[in-house]
């Protein structure tokens, strides 16, 4: 998890947490590319919709302050990912048509960083578990022992699983490997 980005004389220093340890690297550039900035300068106040520069304000059921209007996707100012907008739009449709309202579960949204190798994760991170003081087991499997990786000569990487210490329930997972974004859905 990136905790700080600082411009130095010749480069940029990116500081991040790996577990509880802080590390840093010098880079030439930092790119953040996700979603779009929400357009909220449309006179939403005329419809009784509350908003801020970061997006339209909604309750847990994606309902705006105008109770007959719901919102989903980039206009909420959240993740800015297509699959999140799709999930939110399905929840909005359900909540409009049904009395039993449902809420989005953002813990189940996969996240992918397209670098070499790709890094994909889902659920809670180790930092999240530590902050919440949850007891968990951690298992890390290096790609070098996975037969398919050996055959494809892609041994650099790992799969990390975080599970509830008492129940064994999956709490989070990370894959660092070629095509990790395609594999994370299996977890």
Give names to the regions the model predicted:
Residues 72-130:
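A conserved FAD-binding loop/helix module that cradles the flavin
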Residues 1-11:
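A conserved short coil-to-beta-strand element within the FAD-binding core of flavoproteins
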Residues 4, 48, 61, 160-162:
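Short, surface-exposed charged micro-motifs
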Residues 97-98, 114-187:
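Flexible, glycine-rich terminal cap/loop adjacent to redox cofactors
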Residues 2, 15-24, 36:
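A structured beta-alpha segment of the ubiquitous adenosine-cofactor-binding alpha/beta core
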Residues 50-52, 99-108, 134-139:
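A short alpha-helix-loop-beta-strand transition element characteristic
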Residues 16-20, 60, 165:
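Short acidic, glycine-rich loop/turn motifs
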Residues 24-98, 185:
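FAD-site-proximal beta/loop scaffold in flavoenzymes
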